[in-house]
């Protein structure tokens, strides 16, 4: 489990106006994506049905991802009192859902799915490390640091399970590279677009939905 909780954050130390509008918009968007982890838990639970070890791990992963979303969302509400995290999350979920009713990974195999998950976790760890290093807002810096560490831990989690599957269901290097490149290219997909819209556009123009 993650080594921190929301109660440990000094929310009174948030400095509204200490971040520019662009970074604030990015954090709001990230909050929605992180908070939507339950859909991915459902998807991965179906893909890895029967693998009790992985299913247990992914439940914990989902709880930690949702905590990331809750922390970022609460910070965003304090930094921008006009932001309604719950309303934005509801709008995001109304507009975007991943398919959970599957029996096989969209990557073609469980091994391929774990390659893709490693790409995601390394990218998000770097993303939050960059936020931590770029901001002077004290609470966001702490939260981003916690999340960056968690995401690296999640990368290691998926790497361990990848090694287990690679030993019994190996993927050729070329296939692994293709999966990684494909997932990397999806970094600007519909999920981020909808999250940005729900967090930053819709609250200012409710009729745009």
PLM segments and residue spans:
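Non-heme di-metal
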Residues: 1-209
């Amino acid at each position: 489990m993650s080594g921190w909780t929301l109660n440990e954050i000094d929310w009174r130390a948030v400095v509204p106006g200490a971040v520019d509008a662009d970074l604030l918009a990015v954090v709001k968007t990230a909050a929605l994506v992180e908070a939507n982890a339950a859909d991915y838990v459902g998807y991965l639970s179906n893909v890895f049905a029967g693998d009790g070890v992985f299913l247990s791990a992914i439940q914990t992963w989902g709880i930690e991802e949702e905590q990331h979303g809750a922390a970022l969302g609460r910070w965003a509400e304090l930094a921008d009192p006009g932001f309604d995290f719950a309303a934005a999350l509801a709008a995001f979920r109304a507009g975007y859902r991943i398919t959970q009713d599957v029996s096989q990974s969209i990557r073609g195999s469980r091994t391929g799915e774990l390659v893709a998950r490693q790409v995601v976790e390394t990218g998000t760890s770097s993303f939050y490390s960059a936020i931590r290093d770029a901001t002077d807002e004290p609470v966001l810096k702490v939260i981003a640091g916690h999340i960056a560490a968690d995401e690296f831990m999640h990368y290691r989690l998926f790497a361990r399970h990848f090694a287990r599957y690679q030993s019994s269901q190996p993927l050729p290097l070329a296939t692994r590279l293709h999966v990684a490149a494909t997932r990397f290219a999806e970094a600007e997909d519909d999920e981020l677009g909808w999250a940005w819209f729900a967090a930053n556009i819709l609250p200012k123009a409710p009729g745009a939905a």
